[in-house]
């Protein structure tokens, strides 16, 4: 079957990952000891997308946990599903990366990377037909960003034809955890543009907003934030794990969402988001789901899709619903808001329907959109980067680990190129065909 190898790196990646495994285990009826207690054969039918079956009928996540310090992993191990993971798959150092991308990518991380790759190989060899890798990490710290991107490039070398999907937490505009975030994030994006197939962009501020505004939580914790992310993550691969009328997988997603190879940074959303108390009063309809799914407040990254245009989008529905209704709603959205979709890609929304809804819901939908508005986020990071880099602030921490200023300059210009590519396609119309061809001839 189509297996996925899950890798989580750094504090953020491990916390999101731990939450994700709680959600997935719940969907498949796996308890914290790895035993199956479900009520439907469908839960077991394709459980091997995410789990290996061990002796005595135990199910073990195909997950690799890596970090440069033991702290977060100890808390994962002590957490509710900590005993589920394979002990050999915890790979950690003792030194920490200290929020320094260079430590994660070139020094500390480089020493640990081979032991991580051994575990990755071992998991990949146990697969019948490996679909790809999914990685959860943040771009603001040192391990998830530096070592995460190092791992991505190494895995890319060894498995060039497998899909590499990342769930990357980007530094938020207002909530900053570390001063050097813009450096770490820019250096990471520089890597992700080249080596990843699909990047789902998440940021904490947008998640906080969803918790405050929509879920009416007064004091959201990281646990609440990570729960939102894992709901969307589970939706992306739901079609691989449960039967459906219209299937999708990581590769189909990539083919339908990426019109140009570098533009693979997606916004994700999830609907229905209702506060815990008011859940039982709402029967959701497909039009309501569609409405909420395209709502800017629903996006898990702080970029407003109304400021750009969708190149492509994908709606992954879950639950029993009529295919006809889904198709009608998708057409409806495109016709009514046609100015928000580029006209030179007709029918640019892909939909898929999976029969099994998430726990506690009749219907749900995960939204993945490739919008040119995501450039707002890169612009924001680039401005902060330039402000510091112009004065060479904090640079000695990076050059001290053997990095060169050149690498910063390259990363900066790569990110600026990315922004202008998004802008170019946002402004493009169907009539300008001739001009594009001439431009490409000159390059």
UniProtKB/Swiss-Prot annotation:
CDD domains: beta_tubulin. Residues 429-443 have a biased composition (Acidic residues). It holds the Pfam family Tubulin. The keyword Metal-binding applies. It comes from the Eukaryota. Keywords: Cytoplasm, Cytoskeleton, GTP-binding, Magnesium, Metal-binding, Microtubule, Nucleotide-binding. It is found in: Cytoplasm, Cytoskeleton. GTP binds at residues 11, 69, 138, 142-144, 204, 226. Mg(2+) binds at residue 69. The keyword Cytoplasm applies. Gene3D superfamilies: Helix hairpin bin, Tubulin/FtsZ, C-terminal domain, Tubulin/FtsZ, GTPase domain. Residues 424-443 are annotated as: Disordered. GO terms for cellular component: cytoplasm; microtubule. InterPro entries: Beta-tubulin_BS, Beta_tubulin, Tub_FtsZ_C, Tubulin, Tubulin/FtsZ-like_C, Tubulin/FtsZ_2-layer-sand-dom, Tubulin/FtsZ_GTPase_sf, Tubulin_C. GO terms for biological process: microtubule-based process. GO terms for molecular function: GTP binding; GTPase activity; metal ion binding; structural constituent of cytoskeleton. Its cofactor is Mg(2+). Tubulin is the major constituent of microtubules, a cylinder consisting of laterally associated linear protofilaments composed of alpha- and beta-tubulin heterodimers. Microtubules grow by the addition of GTP-tubulin dimers to the microtubule end, where a stabilizing cap forms. Below the cap, tubulin dimers are in GDP-bound state, owing to GTPase activity of alpha-tubulin. The sequences of the two genes coding for beta-tubulin are identical. Dimer of alpha and beta chains. A typical microtubule is a hollow water-filled tube with an outer diameter of 25 nm and an inner diameter of 15 nM. Alpha-beta heterodimers associate head-to-tail to form protofilaments running lengthwise along the microtubule wall with the beta-tubulin subunit facing the microtubule plus end conferring a structural polarity. Microtubules usually have 13 protofilaments but different protofilament numbers can be found in some organisms and specialized cells. Belongs to the tubulin family. This is Tubulin beta chain. It comes from Tetrahymena pyriformis.
């Amino acid at each position: 079957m189509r297996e996925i190898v899950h890798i989580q790196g750094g504090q953020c990646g491990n916390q999101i990952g731990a939450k994700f495994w709680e959600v997935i285990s719940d969907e498949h009826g796996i308890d914290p000891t790895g035993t199956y207690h479900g009520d439907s054969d469908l839960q077991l039918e394709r459980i091997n997308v995410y789990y290996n079956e061990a002796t005595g009928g135990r199910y073990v996540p195909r997950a690799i946990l890596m970090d440069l310090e033991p702290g977060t992993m100890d808390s994962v191990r002590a957490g509710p599903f900590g005993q589920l993971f394979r002990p050999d798959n915890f790979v950690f150092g003792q030194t920490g990366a200290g929020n320094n991308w260079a430590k994660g990518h070139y020094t500390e991380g480089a020493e640990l990377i081979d032991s991580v790759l051994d575990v990755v190989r071992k998991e990949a060899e146990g697969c019948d037909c490996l679909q790809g890798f999914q990685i959860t990490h943040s771009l603001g710290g040192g391990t998830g960003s530096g070592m995460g991107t190092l791992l991505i490039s190494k895995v890319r070398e060894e498995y060039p034809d497998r899909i590499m999907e990342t769930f990357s937490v980007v530094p938020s505009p207002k909530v900053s955890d570390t001063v050097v975030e813009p450096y770490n994030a820019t250096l990471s994006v520089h890597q992700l543009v080249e080596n990843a197939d699909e990047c789902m962009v998440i940021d904490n501020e947008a998640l906080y907003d969803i918790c405050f505004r929509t879920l009416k939580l007064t004091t959201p914790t990281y646990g609440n934030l990570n729960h939102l992310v894992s709901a969307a993550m589970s939706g992306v691969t739901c079609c691989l794990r449960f039967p459906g009328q219209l299937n999708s997988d990581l590769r189909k997603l990539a083919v339908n969402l990426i019109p140009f190879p570098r533009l693979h940074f997606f916004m994700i959303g999830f609907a229905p988001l209702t506060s815990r108390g008011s859940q039982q009063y709402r029967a959701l309809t497909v039009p309501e789901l569609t409405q909420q799914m395209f709502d800017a407040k629903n996006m898990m990254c702080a970029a407003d899709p109304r400021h750009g245009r969708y190149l492509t989008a994908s709606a992954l529905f879950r639950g029993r619903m009529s295919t006809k209704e889904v198709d009608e709603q998708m057409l409806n959205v495109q016709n009514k808001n046609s100015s928000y979709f580029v006209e030179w890609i007709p029918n640019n929304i892909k939909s898929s329907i999976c029969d099994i809804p998430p726990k506690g819901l009749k219907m749900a939908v995960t939204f993945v959109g490739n919008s040119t508005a995501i450039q707002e986020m890169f612009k924001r990071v680039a401005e902060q980067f330039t402000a510091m880099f112009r004065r060479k602030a904090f640079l000695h921490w990076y050059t001290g680990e053997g990095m060169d200023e050149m690498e910063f300059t390259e990363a900066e210009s790569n990110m600026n190129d990315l922004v202008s590519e998004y802008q170019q396609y946002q402004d493009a119309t169907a009539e300008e065909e001739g001009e594009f061809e001439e431009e490409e001839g000159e390059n």
